[in-house]
Amino acid sequence: MFTPQRNRWPETDRKGKAIAFSDEIITPPPQRVLLREDDDWQKFKEVGLLDEASLERKDRDALIEKILKLEKELFDYQHNMGLLLIEKKQWTSTNNELQQAYDEAMEMLKREKTSNAITLNEADKREENLRKALIDEKQFVAELENDLKYWQREHSVVKSTSEAKLEEANALVIGMKEKALEVDRERAIAEEKFSVMNRKSSELERKLKEVETREKVHQREHLSLVTEREAHEAVFYKQREDLQEWEKKLTLEEDRLSEVKRSINHREERVMENERTIEKKEKILENLQQKISVAKSELTEKEESIKIKLNDISLKEKDFEAMKAKVDIKEKELHEFEENLIEREQMEIGKLLDDQKAVLDSRRREFEMELEQMRRSLDEELEGKKAEIEQLQVEISHKEEKLAKREAALEKKEEGVKKKEKDLDARLKTVKEKEKALKAEEKKLHMENERLLEDKECLRKLKDEIEEIGTETTKQESRIREEHESLRITKEERVEFLRLQSELKQQIDKVKQEEELLLKEREELKQDKERFEKEWEALDKKRANITREQNEVAEENEKLRNLQISEKHRLKREEMTSRDNLKRELDGVKMQKESFEADMEDLEMQKRNLDMEFQRQEEAGERDFNERARTYEKRSQEELDNINYTKKLAQREMEEMQYEKLALEREREQISVRKKLLKEQEAEMHKDITELDVLRSSLKEKRKEFICERERFLVFLEKLKSCSSCGEITENFVLSDLRLPDVEDGDKRFGKQKLKAEEALNISPSAENSKRTSLLGKIASKLLSISPIGKTDKVTDLGITVKLPESSQPDDSLDRVSGEDHEPSATEQSFTDSRIQEGPEGSLQSEMKSDKPRRGRGRGRGRGKSVRGRSQATKAVSRDSKPSDGETPRKRQREQTSRITESEQAAGDSDEGVDSITTGGRRKKRQIAVPVSQTPGQTRYQLRRHRNVGTEEDKAQASKGATEKQERVNDDIRKVPSPKETRTPPEGENRENGKAEVLVETVTHEEIVTVETETVFKVNNTGKNPVEDPQLEVGGSGEIREHGEEDDENISMIEEENEGEEEEETERQGNDASIGKKIWVFFTT
């Protein structure tokens, strides 16, 4: 309980959270009576409860530190709020952009669906007309169907396995640290394997050089086949009319297919962009979750710190209460001590007075008895004086009793005041509103204290009066003594009187000394009381300060609790908002995924429809399909076994994940390199467009010259009619076939083609980075390249021959797809002139394709191919070998007829081919299987994603080759020759002046690449006479190329040795046997 608050306690100094006390106030040392309380006073000094300045200073420092900490926390919260608002704005903007992109994608999908429905209806109408063309295409389509199904199955399996792997990877992340050393070792092993792969690439280059030597051997053999080709060219003229009709239909189909390809490419690009944005969002969501977890951890730490502070405050409060209890106990002890002192004073004063009275009475009686006889008069006076003295003593005793009563009343009042103080303390703790009443009571107590002080002053005055009475008694005694001296007394009486006087003096001195001692003790007690009252007032002040601090601490605690509650609510709101945003974004992502899956399902439905159409025409190729299905089933079973085995081995899967990460990094580097190449290719495409403009202007002039050449050719035909051997062939010509199309029609078609090229430049090349785009591009390009109708659209009749760089010729000879079986002669010049605009574009596409470094693309990553690749290769050879063995004699006849007239009409071809290259340049191989309506970024500039990026030296060689090619094209401008000079030279001249370039057909256990040969003769730089191999039927080279790319990931050294042995066998048989026999030998091996 507290004492009354007379004055507030002084504030104590604080150091941090604890309370430190100083001992600056020097209390006066207690007297003899308070020696036992010395320890208590020393404890007060040590604790520092009496130091006001230090307590105030420490409280201020502690409060300032708290305020600074709270301000810092507020600034941090404000900063975090600002960051969260900025992030929210960014997310809203990104969400709007994604919504816009999604709406655009849905609109495009609707448009594409309608266009696809229209194209399907038209395709149903033209189904009867296209059955003949689809006989050669259905084999490739069947393989593509199997590929698509296989990829779909692989996609589903990969999805399931990827999900399982992700779950297992999340479980195995904990053990990643332990496996870091093993990963480093495996890196070293991978580097060793990389060195081995480099060594193998050097071996492949050596083998490519050997292939070049084989090409030379096949060129020599090709000269022997020229005569056979002339016989086949006659059959070609009969098919010309059918091809013209097919061409008109296929041009429309090609345009529509090109539009479908572009739409598919756009769609796939958007899908890839959506996937990338989804990945970025997932990363951002992970970062946000990490930030939220960090903020939660910080909040938990702050809560713990606040709890610690509250615990410290509670401990301090307990210590303060204990100190209060000690102070109350000491106050009670002091009150008891004061009461004991007062009682002792009263007892001693009473005893002294009684003793003095008794002594004085006895002595006075004796003195009176002795003096009665001598001095009766004096006795009477003395008795009167004694009576007066007794009255005075009675009055003094009455006054002392009154003083004792007053002191008892004051003590009672003090006890009542203490009780009131206790009540007030209880009321202060319970009710704050009663502070005013307590202040009023405190004023009353102050008044009562003042009254007590006034009573004490009255007691002092009474004591002064007692002293005055004592002085008067001494004076009266002196008077009595004088009167006694005045009396005549005998000597004995004088002696006795003197003795009595001395005794009285001694007794009076003793009484005075005792009174002085009592006065001194009273003064000391008064001083002690004053000191105690001062200390009590100081304690009251400190108590008031402590109560004020407690109130402030309670307010601060309430504020902190309110802040905590508000911050918790705010964090909960932010968490709710962030969760809502995350849910919305996840819903958006799910919607995008669902839309993407719906798009894929639509594409799959379209593919299934196409599959149903193509399955009607699969009766002829069931055997090949069954064999390949068996091989695919075996391979799928093996892969399923491998997958089950890999599931059991979690460590290997983690290693594969790491290797995949490295591969992704390499792919990123490849993508950066490809972007640079695409920029260069865009610049080249702009240059090509300008060149096409120049070519268009030059072709107008050349058509006029070609009309003159046509007239010369007609004169030449009239001369040949007289010949017995050539008359029948020349009679089949129709003059209407040699009509040239109008120049305006050519200009219009050239303008359309130019617009297509410009649109191709604006399409972003990111779609070529995905495997899906490459597959779709392969499907479209091969459908056009394999069909016999599309073969008439090639621009090889222009005679553009540009020699490839030496570094890329072997690769092109192995990788390039042979897309045509014949070389159109000059008699079908009217047919080729209608499409003469498409020639430069195709030539430039073949140039860019030949300039790409492809070393290690089909064979660099490993000669070991899977069973699936082998079966496809062998089937392609079987298809190629059938027409060479005589199953398609009609084609052979056509090639012979075309070969007869080709040498006769070479002048027109050479003239037109030379003029078509306005920029000049060296001649190159004939364009092979390059459709005019190509999708941008597919095969024209070789924008397809490479499996392995070439070194910097290969890139430098490729760029150098491109620049050299451009310089050669700018320097070569040829003259118009006469028809006579274009005849086929003899065999010796062909070997000396001409150049025979042969694409070698190589057959291994893994793949078969059939290549079309072509001989280009130069006669005094005035013309060329291309001669084509009639026995090479091209139907599956594109398939083998693609399957080679798909299956070149499995490396086996055993199959590499088998391939080397088979190449040696081809070299042995190359000089003796024909191409058909070689194919049969390779097929049997």
Swiss-Prot record:
Tissue specificity: Expressed at low levels in roots, leaves, flowers and flower stalks.
Coiled coil segments of this chain: 51-149, 185-695
Protein location: Nucleus membrane; Nucleus, Nucleoplasm; Cytoplasm; Nucleus lamina
Region Disordered: start-end pairs: 801-997, 1020-1077
Span(s) of short sequence motif Nuclear localization signal: 404-411
Biased composition (Polar residues): 932-941
InterPro entries: CRWN
Stretches with biased composition (Acidic residues): 1045-1066
Family statement drawn from the similarity comment of this UniProt entry: Belongs to the CRWN family.
Stated name of the protein: Protein CROWDED NUCLEI 3
Organism for this UniProt entry: Arabidopsis thaliana
